[in-house]
Amino acid sequence: MDILKKIEKYREEEQRLKWEGTFADYLEIIKENPMVAQSAHSRVFNMIKDSGIEEIDGRKKYSFFDRELFGLEESLERLVEEYFHPAAKRLDVRKRILLLMGPVSGGKSTLVTMLKKGLEAYTLTDNGAVYAIKGCPMHEDPLHLIPHHLRDDFYREYGIRIEGSLSPLNVMRLEEEYGGRIEDVKVERIFFSEDKRTGIGTFSPSDPKSQDIADLTGSIDFSTIAEYGSESDPRAYRFDGELNKANRGMMEFQEMLKCDEKFLWHLLSLTQEGNFKAGRFALISADELIVAHTNETEYRSFISNKKNEALHSRIIVMPVPYNLKVSEEERIYEKMIAESDVADVHIAPHTLKVAAMFSILTRLKEPKRSDIDLVKKMRLYDGESVEGYNSVDVEDMKKEYNDEGMSGIDPRYVINRISSTIIRKNMESINSLDVLRSLKEGLDQHPSISSEDRERYLNFISAARKEYDDIAKKEVQKAFVYSYEESAKTLMDNYLDNVEAYCNKNKLRDPLTGEEMNPDEKLMRSIEEQIGISENAKKAFREEILIRISAYARKGKRFDYNSHERLREAIQKKLFADLKDVVKITTSTKTPDEQQLKKVNEVVARLIDEHGYNSTSANELLKYVGSLLNR
């Protein structure tokens, strides 16, 4: 389907969704679907809920945020369950300004943009449909037409509560255009759009001396004031401020705390009473979610100013910290790179992971337990299993600091350094070492890093390098061991025979001489030590292997090289330890013999086919690991 056909199809769909009728027709719609009359907060909550909620380990995960926000599950759960959900149920939190507070590039703006774009799409669905009085610049709720003294009767009949009063303009239109006949008032379906300023508004502070309150509440229309003769005639007023246009939806208040105080006082009345003052009119009702964002420094100075006390209680603060999981940070970088023009550059496996490790280390706070260092903490936070620790330890660590993740290196800095590496090297391939080098060089140019932080960050780069060294060795180890797969299987079978004899207190028979002999303790320990099985734990480990073999046998399956992850790792490490010399020779010899060359080519092919390297990065990895082993 070409683009013009898609445009035509979209236009047809838009026409199909349009609806216009009288207030009487609208009442029939809400009788069938009361969701249509929901509040702004309820609409936002239902939009998030309708995208899907999954429960993982007792935590709620919202599909709505999945595409753009990574590693913020706990913050998002808190935001939805402590603000949107109770606000949708008409509880008192809906009378608060939602203030997202967090470090730069932490996802605050992305979160707000997602809510805005989400609402635009949601109002195109049946559940998110919004109807308004036709011709109203504030797209007012048609239910405001019902007089206050009849609203209790309406609630008993429809089960819908009505809040707010008809705006001055619509009061006049009702009398002049419809002769006071509410049932004849024209109602239309509207679709939220930030571009068309329908249901979504954005207010950004500028110079306090030149910025006018009219930006928020609208202004006198000088082109019609001569015609209507009075400033208090609503027809001589332009209801085009952000608060007017964001009615029924949401308004983003950018850098709210930088705003002049006179702008903030309007928000007090709007959040608490659901109305605001504009021109020479009665209070104007508005139903909108107000979202603001700021950083921690500005928030602290705002709180310390006694003049702002009345606003403090009208604000609900939601911290949006940096992500603290390596795997999720990696996804952030992948997304940012995919959106750029360098998406075709080959980035060697683990490059983004190593950059993510550095970022996360800068954001973590030193654990209070002496037996856990930052690298272990980083692994545990990422869901890796670290021997001797469990999920309870992770939860305890998370409770140690309330502000963990509110400082550290931001994702944009890392992406800038990766971009710089790609552009400077002008190559088709970059690896972890290139990026670590670039991160190190960039620290001097980072404006907000103190000399003390710089020292810490250099240590974190070294820590990330050590982690990469281990990853690189393992990667080459796997590729080499595959080439010696038969040796691995033989070693495995040999180990299992010995374990079986050990556990059953039997002897083994020598295949050549036929003599009986004791299980080979030296062989078993040389394998078990590779994965840290202590002398005291060896019996339990061997028995567990035997139980696993029996369980497989009962199901008619064969226990093989891939059946036990830790044992496979131990076999690989043992074999690699035995093969180290081969790796050293094949990677460091200037002129390898034919046999060695064949082996190197096999390993390179394996790295390319199964591990995601290209020819350049695979050869660089081999050389690097060879140099590590030669140290």
UniProtKB/Swiss-Prot annotation:
Q: What is the documented disruption phenotype for this protein?
A: Disruption of the gene results in decreased sporulation. The mutant exhibits defects in spore formation. Disruption significantly reduces the expression of the transcriptional factor sigmaK and its downstream target genes.
Phosphothreonine modifications at: 217
**Effect of mutating residue 219 to E:** Partially phosphorylated. Is still able to bind ATP
Task: Please give the Gene3D superfamilies that the UniProt record associates with this protein.
Answer: P-loop containing nucleotide triphosphate hydrolases (3.40.50.300)
Q: What is its main location?
A: other
Q: Which domain of life is it from?
A: Bacteria
Q: What induces it?
A: Transcriptionally regulated by sigma-E.
Q: What is the effect of changing residue 217 to E?
A: Lack of phosphorylation. Is still able to bind ATP. Strongly reduces sporulation rate
Citing just one GO molecular function, the answer is: protein kinase activity
Please give the SUPFAM superfamilies that the UniProt record associates with this protein: P-loop containing nucleoside triphosphate hydrolases
Alphabetical list of PANTHER family matching this protein? PROTEIN KINASE PRKA (PTHR30267), PROTEIN PRKA (PTHR30267:SF2)
Q: What does this protein do?
A: ATP-dependent protease that regulates sporulation. Is able to bind and hydrolyze ATP. This ATP-dependent protease activity is necessary for efficient sporulation of B.subtilis. In vitro, can hydrolyze alpha-casein, an exogenous substrate of Lon proteases, in an ATP-dependent manner. PrkA also modulates sporulation by negatively regulating the transcriptional regulator Hpr/ScoC to induce the expression of sigK. The control of sporulation mediated via the Hpr/ScoC regulator is probably indirect.
Name listed for the protein in its UniProt record: ATP-dependent protease PrkA
Species the sequence originates in: Bacillus subtilis (strain 168)
